[in-house]
Amino acid sequence: MQVINLKKYEKLETIYQIWNAEYGNIYPISAELFNRNIENIYEKASYVAVDDGKLIGFVIGKVWHDVYKIKGYDEIGWISLIYVTPKYRKQGIGTKLLSMCENALIEYGVSIINLGKDYNNYFPGLPIDLVKIQPWFQKRGYEFTYQTHDLISRTNKKISIKNNYFKFISAD
């Protein structure tokens, strides 16, 4: 098994593909979403784990490095996404990826590391459907702070549009 920097990994599409193989039915990551979210990663905190040329895990770390300063954000690092394929779990790979990411974030100077809820995030934290993973993070020093919820509005409500607001033009 080899760990390499994410920016040096040439098959980036396999990152969201292995995620989607397990979680795509509830938390799909499209190519567009993935590419948008890795634009602002912290390279020194983002890695992939490869075994015989096959991607088996990854971690994506972020720090605030936008030109617009937000008070307190310079003290925060984020673990945007972390994953190890089922076959390779319970072998210390996730722990190694997490540790490498955390060490890079600490070296950068952050004093708080959040799981998720980064800007341009995939998740606002640990998804409720993945609650079985929570003890793994707690064992590594992460604390449950609060729960967030997705809110849904149904769009099947009838909307009335009056013709006097629009001018209809025919193709003739």
Model-derived segments and spans:
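Conserved acetyl-CoA-binding loop-helix of GNAT-fold acetyltransferases
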Residues: V84, K90-I106
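Acyl-donor-binding surface of acyltransferase catalytic domains
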Residues: S99-S170
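Short amphipathic alpha-helix that is part of the acyltransferase structural core
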Residues: M1-F34, Y42-V50, L55, T145-I152, ...
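A short, internal acetyl-CoA/4′-phosphopantetheine-binding micro-motif in the GNAT/acyltransferase core
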Residues: I79-R89, D118-N120
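Alpha-helical elements of Rossmann-like donor-binding domains used by nucleotide-donor carbohydrate transfer enzymes
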Residues: T14-I18, K96, M100, K132
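A conserved beta-turn-beta hairpin within the catalytic core of GNAT-like acetyltransferases
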Residues: H65-I79, R89, Y108-S111
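Conserved beta-strand in the GNAT
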Residues: V48, K54-H65, W78, Y83
